């Protein structure tokens, strides 16, 4: 039996004993007793219908009289102790007679009867208080900070070697490490370290990992808390937790305080319908005060992470608070390769695994995606009973992460399977032929994920940060290649192109309304995203143009999509023979890799230009 079970058993026993003594004390000691004169007592005894059932004669001259209906009386009659006639009369009436000694023992019994319940009550109360003040109870720690403190040590210590794909951010954070290690170096020349550092970047880019790496490099305590941990139902709790957090930080300085998802508490004040959330605003106000109230020379660095810096309160971002902002971008190809090396260094890899190729095939993946990819590949290898992770495992893992797990058991009729094959082959052919099309890495007609009956995987040759009008038009044409193939080959269209049409329409509308790529409307932006209601979630789109312009926008969007669709059908008709060959191979193999696809298309294909 472990310690907690023993304490629970003792607690139960204490409760039972306490209840027993309390019942005895209140029932016996406080039972209703009435005084009765000796004359009335004699009359009750001599009455033919006597209700007396028992008489207890005590040596102190007190008679305790019990009636048949449960009432109790006391009679003061000192002479009754030696009155033999009274005793004979009681016996003759059939009344039970007994004696009772009243002395020191009775006194101590009364004392113990009072003290024992009191002592037991105190013991139980202390036990309850001890339990409530335990580490996992919130009754007495409701206003305490929920921050978790990590002390870098041993294998759990995270350093910059454990972070990949964020070299610029690491360079910016190295001076923070130097300050935490040797503050006097900066104090001598009057330099002030930023009180707050805001890490900005999409989810999964490693913002929390960077903060822990700074603490690990400087070998200082690391306080981690989420912005949502401050705000509670009761007003004032969040502000109290902020005060407690900074009190703990000052006690462990030098240290790092890291607030994850700070937008949960740091949103613009006064935003929203009906005013702001009083508790959140009080918490934010207290955070602002605390960041003003400590000196950066104390060695406390406040770091925070968010993927929505645009909704943060301006007072939080002014110099003297979060005055240093570091952008953590998604990694490029070299960054992805380094991240893969970090996540695979303790995993057995087969000789055919090429991390550079995997990095090229995962554009847009952030650190969290790549870690999940490596883990998925390891799970696949373990499922197959292999001792090492092969390149095939990584290829399948990429497909599973992008499109979902294969559903090979899903039954599809031969007719629908052929339609799906032409649809996916249409995407591949058009994307290969257009001048700015992304190279096709794989096409498959194996159903995956929730809805996908097939998919075409593109592999960009490099990471791109700008996109031209012609590139967008080529992308639109490739998106509509599947539907174009259905119409050209079967003379009919299916619902399989619904998502392609939705994406194509969205791209075309953005070209017209946001990017100024419409020949008819010119380089103007039409419409404005309305975000003033809740600051952080788009509610509607402000229409700042006339009905005539709205009609022209719709015409331009339709024109762009229609032209790209006609262009896609033209490509399908021109390369119908190659399309049919790809479909036959696809129906046989169900999956065609990019090299084989390009070999089928061969070098004589000319790029189609408008």
Swiss-Prot record:
Asked if the keyword Transmembrane belongs to this entry, the reply reads: yes
State the organism of origin. Answer: Thermotoga maritima (strain ATCC 43589 / DSM 3109 / JCM 10099 / NBRC 100826 / MSB8)
**Gene Ontology molecular function: any one:** metalloendopeptidase activity
Any idea where this protein resides? Cell inner membrane
Task: Print the keywords alphabetically.
Answer: ATP-binding, Cell inner membrane, Cell membrane, Hydrolase, Membrane, Metal-binding, Metalloprotease, Nucleotide-binding, Protease, Transmembrane, Transmembrane helix, Zinc
Q: Which GO terms describe its cellular component?
A: plasma membrane
Active site positions, chain numbering: 424
Residue intervals passing through the bilayer: 6-26, 108-128
Q: Which residues bind ATP?
A: 164, 204-209, 343, 371
Give the function comment from the record. Answer: Acts as a processive, ATP-dependent zinc metallopeptidase for both cytoplasmic and membrane proteins. Plays a role in the quality control of integral membrane proteins.
Protein name, as recorded = ATP-dependent zinc metalloprotease FtsH
Which family is annotated? In the central section; belongs to the AAA ATPase family. In the C-terminal section; belongs to the peptidase M41 family.
Binding site residues for Zn(2+): 423, 427, 500
Ranges facing Periplasmic side: 27-107
Q: How is the cofactor bound?
A: Binds 1 zinc ion per subunit.
């Amino acid at each position: 039996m472990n310690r907690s079970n023993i304490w629970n058993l003792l607690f139960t026993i204490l409760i039972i004993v306490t209840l027993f003594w309390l019942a005895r004390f209140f029932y016996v000691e406080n039972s209703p007793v009435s005084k009765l004169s000796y004359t009335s007592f004699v009359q009750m005894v001599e009455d033919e219908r006597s209700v007396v059932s028992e008489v207890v004669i005590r040596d102190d001259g007190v008679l305790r009289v019990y009636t048949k209906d449960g009432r109790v009386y006391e009679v003061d009659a000192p002479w009754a102790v030696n009155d033999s006639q009274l005793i004979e009369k009681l016996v003759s009436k059939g009344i039970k007679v007994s004696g009772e000694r009243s002395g020191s023992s009775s006194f101590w019994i009364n004392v113990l009867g009072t003290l024992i319940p009191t002592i037991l009550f105190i013991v139980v109360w202390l036990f309850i208080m001890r339990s409530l003040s335990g580490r996992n109870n919130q009754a007495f720690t409701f206003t305490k900070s929920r921050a978790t403190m990590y002390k870098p040590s041993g294998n759990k210590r995270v350093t910059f070697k454990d972070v990949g794909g964020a070299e610029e951010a690491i360079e910016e954070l190295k001076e923070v490490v130097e300050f935490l290690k040797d503050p006097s170096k900066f104090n001598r020349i009057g330099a002030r370290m930023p009180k707050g550092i805001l890490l900005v970047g999409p989810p999964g880019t490693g913002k929390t990992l960077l903060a822990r790496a700074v603490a690990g490099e400087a070998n200082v305590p690391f306080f981690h808390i989420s912005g949502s941990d401050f705000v509670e139902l009761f007003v004032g709790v969040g502000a109290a937790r902020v005060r407690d957090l900074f009190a703990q930080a000052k006690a462990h300085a030098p240290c790092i305080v890291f607030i994850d998802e700070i937008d949960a508490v740091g949103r613009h004040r006064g935003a929203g319908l009906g005013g702001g959330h009083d508790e959140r605003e009080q918490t934010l106000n207290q955070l602002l005060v605390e960041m003003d109230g400590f000196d950066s020379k104390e060695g406390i660095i406040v770091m925070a992470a968010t993927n929505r810096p645009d909704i943060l309160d301006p007072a939080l971002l002014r110099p003297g608070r979060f005055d240093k902002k570091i952008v953590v971008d998604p990694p490029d190809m070299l960054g992805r390769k380094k991240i893969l090396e970090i996540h695979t260094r303790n995993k057995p890899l087969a000789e055919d695994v090429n991390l550079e190729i995997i990095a090229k095939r995962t554009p847009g993946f952030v650190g969290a995606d790549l870690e999940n990819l490596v883990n998925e590949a390891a799970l696949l290898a373990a499922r197959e009973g292999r001792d090492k992770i092969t390149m095939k495992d990584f290829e399948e893992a990429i497909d599973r992460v992008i499109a979902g797990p294969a559903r090979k058991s899903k039954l599809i009729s031969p007719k629908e399977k052929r339609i799906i094959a032409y649809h996916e082959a249409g995407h591949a052919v058009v994307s290969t032929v257009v001048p700015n099309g992304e190279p096709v890495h794989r096409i498959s007609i194996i159903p995956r994920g929730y809805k996908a009956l097939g998919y075409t995987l593109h592999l960009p040759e490099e990471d791109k940060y700008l996109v031209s009008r012609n590139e967008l038009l080529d992308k639109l044409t490739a998106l509509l290649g599947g539907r174009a193939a259905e119409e050209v080959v079967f003379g009919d269209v299916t619902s399989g192109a619904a998502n392609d049409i939705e994406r194509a329409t969205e791209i075309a509308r953005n070209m017209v309304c946001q990017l100024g790529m419409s020949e008819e409307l010119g380089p103007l932006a039409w419409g404005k995203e309305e975000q003033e209601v809740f600051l952080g979630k788009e509610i509607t789109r402000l229409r700042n143009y006339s009905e005539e312009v709205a009609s022209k926008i719709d015409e331009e969007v339709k024109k762009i999509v229609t032209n790209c669709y006609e262009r896609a059908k033209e490509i399908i008709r021109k390369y119908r023979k190659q399309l049919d060959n790809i479909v036959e191979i696809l129906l046989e193999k169900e999956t065609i890799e990019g090299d084989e696809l390009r070999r089928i298309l061969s070098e004589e294909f000319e790029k189609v230009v408008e």
